[in-house]
Amino acid sequence: MNRANLLKLSARLGAALAFAANMTLGCHAQDLPTLPDYVPHEHVSGTIRSSGNDQMAGLMKRWERAFMKYQPDVRFVDTLKGTASGIYGLEMRTADIALMGRAMNPFERYGTYERSWTYPVEIEVATGSAYMPRKSPAFAIFVHRDNPLSKLTLKQLDGIFGAERGGGWKALSWDEDAARPSGQNIRTWGALGLKGDWIDKPINVYGPPSQGAGAVPFFRARVLNGGAMWNEDLREYADRGRMMADLARDPYGIAYAALSYGNEQVKPLALAETDAGPMVSVDKANVANRSYPLARPVYVVYTIDDDRSEIADPRVDPKVREFLRFILSRQGQEAVAQEGSYLPLPLKVVQEQIRKLDSKETPPEKLLLGE
C-alpha cells in the first residue's frame, strides 16, 4: 500500500473511531433516576456461576463488584466463552445463569428441558449497542445514497426480504397467523412508491447467510414474523464489509447490518412498526428508548427445575433472584451506562422484567409439552 492510500485509510479509521466514541460517550439516562433502588429482599450467600457471552464480561464484572457491596457473602465464577456456551452451562448444571447476546431459539429451549429437566427464563438486562459491533448492535436498513427512499415499515421490510410462508415461530409455538401469500412480496422499487426510472427497477436484496446464527434469528423474528422463507434472490454474505462494499456500487440494493458497517455511499432508513408510524431513525437515543424497531436486547437466562426432577427445587435460586433484582435496579443500570458498550433499559422494560422474575405462571415449555 502506497503512502497516499495509507494516509487515506488512517484518516477513515480515525473518523470511524471518533464517530464510535461519540456514539458511546455518556448514556441515555433520562429513565435512570426513576428506576427502583436496589433494596435487598434477603441476605444471600454462596457462589453464582455464569457462562455465556464473552462480550458481556466487562459489564458482568461491574455488576459483580457493585452487587457485592450489598451482598458481601456472594462470590462469582465466570466462564464466558460465547453465547452458545451459556446454554450448555445451564443444561449441564455447571452454571446458574447464562449471559446471552441474543434470545434463545425454540430448539435451545426444548433442548434445555429435554437434557436437564429445567425451564429456562429469559430476563432482559440491557439494550444492545446503537453502534458498536459485537455488542448486540441494532440493525440498520441500508440503501444506496442516491436512492430517494427515506423510510419503511416492518411490513414492507417483510415484503422485501421475505417470501410466501405458512406461518412462523412465536417463542415455542408455530403460529399460522404469521402466514402470508406471495402476493405480499415486494420486488420492485415502484412497489414502494418510487417514480420515474425507479418504477420497474428490481430490489436487489443483500444480507448475512439466511440460516446464520446469532443476529439472523432476531431479524427473522422481528421482520419475517418468525418465518424462515427468504426472498428467493437474497444475496448472502458471510463478510459484512464486502456486502456493504457491493451495496455501495448498487443503486438498486438494500441490506441489513449494524450501523458500524455503513460507508459514504449508503444511508440508513427510518423505520416504523406499523403503517400508522411513527417513523424512527436509528440513533443512540432511539435505540436506548426502544422506539427504534430493530433495537436488540441482551439477556440473563436462569432455569427453574421441573417439579418431577430428582434434584428439584422449583423456586428461583435466592442468590440469583437477588442478583437479577440488582441488575434491574437503578444501581444495576447505572453500571450498564458506565460500562459504555451497552445501553440501560427504559423504565417500562425494567418493570416488565421484574414482573417476569416474580411470576408464578407455569413455564410455556411445560404447557406445550403437555406436562
Outline where the language-model segments fall:
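Intrinsically disordered/low-complexity terminal segments and short unstructured peptides
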Residues: 4, 21-23, 50
